[in-house]
From Swiss-Prot:
Gene designation per UniProt: pyrG
Family the entry assigns: Belongs to the CTP synthase family.
Further remarks about this protein from its record: CTPSs have evolved a hybrid strategy for distinguishing between UTP and CTP. The overlapping regions of the product feedback inhibitory and substrate sites recognize a common feature in both compounds, the triphosphate moiety. To differentiate isosteric substrate and product pyrimidine rings, an additional pocket far from the expected kinase/ligase catalytic site, specifically recognizes the cytosine and ribose portions of the product inhibitor.
The entry's keywords: ATP-binding, Glutamine amidotransferase, Ligase, Magnesium, Metal-binding, Nucleotide-binding, Pyrimidine biosynthesis
Positions bound to Mg(2+): D71, E139
Transmembrane segments: none
Ligand binding (UTP): S13, K186, T187, K188, P189, T190, Q191, K222
Taxonomic path: Bacteria, Pseudomonadati, Pseudomonadota, Gammaproteobacteria, Pseudomonadales
Residues noted as binding CTP in the record, renumbered to the chain: S13, D146, I147, E148, K186, T187, K188, P189, T190, Q191, K222
Residues at which ATP binds: S14, L15, G16, K17, G18, I19, D71
HAMAP family the UniProt entry points to: PyrG
Domain of life: Bacteria
Cellular component GO terms, alphabetical: cytosol
Listed name of the protein: CTP synthase
Length: 542
């Protein structure tokens, strides 16, 4: 039977519930347990797919094509379990489902209320998402006291009571601030946060106390006394120089032992040697490169969370410190390519909308003409094709129909039809809804032998995740290829261009898929690893 660890946060947001939860999950997995994780988001959007990257950050795409919270990316980077659409749901998704059932008459005329109908649906989805895991960690988004979180907190209160104390526990993250003028940490915010939880019927079993200063034993003892939590279950989690230290920090304080004993689980001791190797490679690099990352959401780097982590993983794999130089593509439009000078490689990630696109195209041209290693992802591939059409073929009006529907040479256009993962044919028009209408999830891709991308992966067929509506226009593709554009990857049926490369360039690869979603600190990713190797070669050449 599945055991549940419910994870909540108090005092302030952005305490790192996702990292702490994933780190505990990693330790339990290292003890031989089957672990999964869920994220419950209180916002009313059905999913984050149409939310602004400036507000929400990255949309993480699962293998089965769900657009989810970026915390699921942390989950997959810390544990081996692959997340699905069942591992993340929102208030909007819950209400949408309940209202659809009400319209069908499934409730037989009953008055639909938050309790029991909404809370029952939340509990049903938690149980479904947990599946047959030994332990399921369920993270509740937001902060205790928020009105939006109340149905979720009530649902976990009920579920905790229904399955019993031997199968459910509550881990609460709080902030223990350091007051510089007093020269000490303060426990009062934690006490009040727990008081808020207890007022709605939830007593924490574990407190993870976040701080930027050490929390001494007397403070932990005081917190335990005022919150009715065992002293050994009051965990001090100070800021770390890398998040991949967190599993070791939690293990050193015995958190996994406490969980295993509480649940009565029989399992091995934790083997964290893989994480020790990751931390060692991260903190003791032998080389260093600088990569210019040209994007349009630089005001909130969480919009590129998986990509930034993937570059870190590539550095770990190559024992190389990867310095990312974040450049807003609009700054290139205004200030020119001097911003790119001195970079060992150039990375152009995905994005939507016209703003900043010309700056990305300029960055591609700089990389191609100056033989600087280039990696383009999603839109980064599309702008590479546009740049090639404009500056190699002379089609000065070349563009994507996303930016100019009247372009004389629409080298990138809307995908009007494709088969989804089930084989069903989906169609789209410019008037289609934005939500849930993209080519999403894992798709097979055939790689051309002898290509740079084939050298990276070392295989003929790969599977990568997608999130896009636009593709290279097949009607103009033959002319692009005749002019020297290398198509080194295609969809399984050969209908869609997945990877392009540039002839006579040391390393120029642009892909339509998002390889960052499958990169992990322990395994890295072959494409990013190859990119960093190319950057090292460029630096050594200079």
């Amino acid at each position: 039977m599945t055991r549940y660890i419910f994870v909540t946060g108090g005092v302030v947001s952005s305490l790192g519930k996702g990292i702490a939860s994933a780190s505990l999950a990693a330790i339990l997995e290292a003890r031989g347990l089957k672990v999964t994780m869920l994220k419950l988001d209180p916002y009313i959007n059905v999913d984050p797919g149409t939310m602004s990257p400036f507000q929400h950050g990255e949309v993480f795409v699962t293998h089965d094509g769900a657009e989810t919270d970026l915390d699921l990316g942390h989950y997959e980077r810390f544990i081996r379990t692959t997340m699905t659409q069942n591992n993340n749901f929102t208030t909007g998704r819950i209400y949408e489902h309940v209202l659809r059932k009400e319209r069908r008459g499934d409730y037989l005329g009953a008055t639909i209320q938050v309790i029991p109908h909404i809370t029952d649906e939340i509990k049903r989805r938690i149980i479904k998402g947990a599946g047959d895991a030994d332990v399921a960690l369920v993270e509740i988004g937001g902060t205790v006291g928020d009105i939006e979180s109340q149905p979720f907190l009530e649902a976990i209160r009920q579920l905790r009571f229904e399955v019993g104390a031997k199968r459910a526990m509550l881990m609460h993250l709080t902030l223990v601030p350091y007051i510089a003028t007093a020269g000490e940490t303060k426990t009062k915010p934690t006490q009040h946060s727990v008081k808020e939880l207890r007022s709605i019927g939830l007593q924490p079993d574990v407190l993870v106390c976040r701080s930027d200063h050490p929390i001494d034993s007397s403070s932990r003892r005081k917190i335990a006394q005022f919150t009715n939590v065992e002293e050994r279950a009051v965990i001090a989690l100070e800021d770390a120089d890398t998040i991949y230290k967190i599993p070791g920090i939690l293990h050193a304080q015995g958190l996994d032992d406490f969980v295993v004993e509480r649940f009565g689980l029989q399992c091995n001791s934790a083997d964290l040697s893989e994480w020790d190797k990751v931390v060692d490679a991260k903190l003791n690099p032998e080389h260093e490169v600088t990569i210019a990352m040209v994007g349009k959401y630089m005001e909130l780097l969480d919009a590129y969370k998986s990509l930034i982590e993937a570059m870190s993983h590539a550095g770990i794999t190559n024992r190389t410190k990867v310095n990312l130089r974040y450049i807003d593509s609009e700054d290139i439009e205004n200030q020119g390519t001097s911003l790119l000078e001195g970079a060992d490689a150039i990375l152009v990630p995905g994005g939507f909308g016209l703003r900043g696109v010309e700056g990305k195209i300029t960055a591609v041209q700089y990389a191609r003409e100056n033989k600087v290693p280039y990696l383009g992802i999603c839109l980064g591939m599309q702008v590479a094709v546009i740049e090639f059409a404009r500056n190699v073929m002379g089609w000065k009006d070349a563009n994507s129909t996303e930016f100019d529907r009247n372009s004389g040479h629409p080298v990138v256009g809307l995908i009007t039809e494709w088969a989804d993962a089930t084989g069903a044919v989906e169609t789209r028009t410019e008037a289609s809804d934005l939500g849930g209408t993209m080519r999403l999830g894992a798709q097979d891709c055939q790689l051309a032998a002898g290509s740079k991308v084939h050298d990276c992966y070392g295989k003929d067929v790969i599977t990568e995740r997608h999130r896009h509506r636009y593709e290279v226009n097949n009607n103009l593709l033959p002319q692009l290829v005749d002019a020297g554009l290398v198509v080194s990857g295609r969809s399984e049926d050969g209908a869609l261009v997945e990877v392009v490369e540039s002839k006579d360039h040391p390393w120029f690869v642009a892909c339509q898929f998002h390889p960052e979603f499958t990169s992990t600190p322990r395994d890295g990713h072959p494409l990013f690893s190859g990119f960093v190797k190319a950057a090292l070669a460029q630096k050594n050449k200079a």
